[in-house]
Amino acid sequence: MPSPPPTPETATASDRTATPAPGMPILAVDAMGGDSAPGMVIAGLDIAAERHPNARFEVFGDAVQIDELVRLSKRLRNRVSIRPTTEIIPNELKPTAALRLRDASLRRAIDAVANGEAAGVISAGNTGAMLALAKIVLKTMSGIDRPAMAAIGPSARGDVVMLDLGANVVCDARNLVEFAVMGELFARTVLGLPHPTIGLLNVGSEEMKGDETLRRAAEALRESPIGPQFRGFIEGHDIAGGTVDVVVTDGFTGNVALKTGEGALRLVGDLLRRVFSANIASRLAYLLARPGLTRLREWLDPRRYNGAVLLGLNGVVVKSHGGADAEGFAHAVDVAMDMIVNRFNDRIRDDLGRHADRERLASDAFRATPPASATSVTTG
């Protein structure tokens, strides 16, 4: 007598691989990346599943652990396909070594995007390995020289998009213009801004400031279709000040600015805790200020801004912070789903077509220039 078909309660990892309905957005998930994986990852998917009822998840990693966790979630039972893998990429592993781990959960998740099994991939694992694997496996989109890492952060005027954050240490003018095009669309797609403003990060706001690369990029942006949205050069304090919606820079400068901002936020938090716990009077003051401080903490909550995106590849690639909790990971899933549902990559191709043909992108305004250390730089 044949055994009855498995129910959601009795299904094993290999059973839960139903084909999704047409039009369902599918996200490939590296379940083994992150400080608290796979528990944090599955808990984050559980939160995200409620916000994205049509989404499905291809989850890669230790099938036994993942299956036990998925069984605990009614929302995930029929929306997760578990893909067993035998290898994990540790955080300390160099990208060159990670490339050799063909059955690693991160590699298999990226492969799923390349094979058309998923529209995007998310991981909280090794950043360097994810960058290297995504570039090699997915490759850059036609019309894009280099991908860029973008993220959202707080500013005095709301949220701000910043790129590149470390994918490209040295950039030429053409790269910066491409970053601006991608960042502008990212702000429209994820932040919902109809006409986001753009600024080039520099050592001063005057037109003669900076090196030749920045000046050429600024000239090209002024003449581009997004020229009316380009506000010229901005300085470091303009990032938090909200002078523009999209901050464009090279990966070295962007990464330093990002880490500096994160450190400044931690310092503010530490100082507030010290001030309001110093004595009885300060504790009473805290009680009076508590509603406002609660709103401030919510506004600056790093979980709201979790989810850096590698733009310019043939597929959506989202990197969650390795130390994120379930809510933070769910926010990173939100970013990925926004990009998938809004057909971000298709729109990038359309925008690049509007900007210039390949001959213009190869013109003098976009040609590579030496790094700032080898050229004349005017500072403030």
Curated annotation (Swiss-Prot):
Q: Which GO terms describe its cellular component?
A: cytoplasm
Protein's UniProt keywords contain Lipid biosynthesis: yes
InterPro entries to which the protein is assigned, alphabetical? FA_synthesis (IPR003664), Phospholipid_synth_PlsX-like (IPR012281)
Localization, per the record, is: Cytoplasm
The residues that cross the membrane are: none
Q: Where is the signal peptide?
A: none
Keywords carried by this UniProt record = Cytoplasm, Lipid biosynthesis, Lipid metabolism, Phospholipid biosynthesis, Phospholipid metabolism, Transferase
Residue ranges of the region described as Disordered: 1-23
The name on file for this protein is Phosphate acyltransferase
- Species of origin: Acidiphilium cryptum (strain JF-5)
